């Protein structure tokens, strides 16, 4: 029997970026799901610098009578995980659930996550069944999940699904972390004592397009590699050693062949020498790029700039105000 504290209030955190078409339905379905809980609840919508009317719709929802919606407006786009962290800093619940705004993960799954967390788990992840994504998105997700499992040793099936539940101590601990590159599911699992996963439905995206383009997925993979482990640096050292030994061996071989076969053979081997040279130069540039990625992240962390700036927070039945402090 787990000895976790009882859950008295649930907070649902939803980052929003240009989701004006899905937002009314999202609010309706999420509110209905939360009303079915036998606990207090709140919904936090975080506008991540949307250029459409998402922010206006959020503010209107917060100002309705008997609203449970808190709207947090960031001054520009900072990315999905930064927006979620901004929401975490304003929650008041004992259990915090994250949910995407595109309705591909049904809000109706929220009671199941709460019930599972009530069993004493610190983190409740989800695995999408019958994924309604493109082949490219599915393939990229499999690669990312495999990469995470290999580097962290945490065998969870679907790190890419943001429909997840976290107990408050996990959230508080994550808020004390100040690294710029934050991948919330992994960071939470680092601190979780008991974590589990449940299968959930996955629907097609009805409105708009995915906000994760090819380049954003590539950047995400770089983030995962460099923020999770220093193994690539060790592999780089190993690769450098192999190349150095190979280069020395090749040099000895070329000298022997030059002495055995004469200068004419050496002249005819110029192109091979250039090929070897370009191989070594390419390996050096790969290594320099990887080192630069790590150094750049160290530089960003040392500057300790805020990950986001909260422009306004609109609470239910209250007047909007501008925050002087930011995270």
Swiss-Prot record:
Record-linked InterPro entries: ArnC_tfrase, Glyco_trans_2-like, Glycosyltransferase_2, Nucleotide-diphossugar_trans
Matching Gene3D superfamilies: Spore Coat Polysaccharide Biosynthesis Protein SpsA, Chain A
Enzyme kind, highest EC tier: transferase
CDD domains linked: DPM1_like_bac
Sequence intervals crossing the membrane: 236-256, 270-290
Gene Ontology biological process terms in this record: 4-amino-4-deoxy-alpha-L-arabinopyranosyl undecaprenyl phosphate biosynthetic process; lipid A biosynthetic process; lipopolysaccharide biosynthetic process; response to antibiotic
The entry's keywords: Antibiotic resistance, Cell inner membrane, Cell membrane, Glycosyltransferase, Lipid A biosynthesis, Lipid biosynthesis, Lipid metabolism, Lipopolysaccharide biosynthesis, Membrane, Transferase, Transmembrane, Transmembrane helix
Catalysed reaction equations from the record: UDP-4-deoxy-4-formamido-beta-L-arabinose + di-trans,octa-cis-undecaprenyl phosphate = 4-deoxy-4-formamido-alpha-L-arabinopyranosyl di-trans,octa-cis-undecaprenyl phosphate + UDP
Chain ranges on the Periplasmic side, renumbered to this chain: 257-269
Keyword Lipid metabolism: yes
Cellular component terms per the entry's GO annotation: plasma membrane
EC number per UniProt: 2.4.2.53
Cytoplasmic-facing ranges: 1-235, 291-327
Subcellular localization: Cell inner membrane
Entries under PANTHER family matching the protein: UNDECAPRENYL-PHOSPHATE 4-DEOXY-4-FORMAMIDO-L-ARABINOSE TRANSFERASE, UNDECAPRENYL-PHOSPHATE 4-DEOXY-4-FORMAMIDO-L-ARABINOSE TRANSFERASE-RELATED
UniProt record similarity statement: Belongs to the glycosyltransferase 2 family.
Protein name stated in the entry: Undecaprenyl-phosphate 4-deoxy-4-formamido-L-arabinose transferase
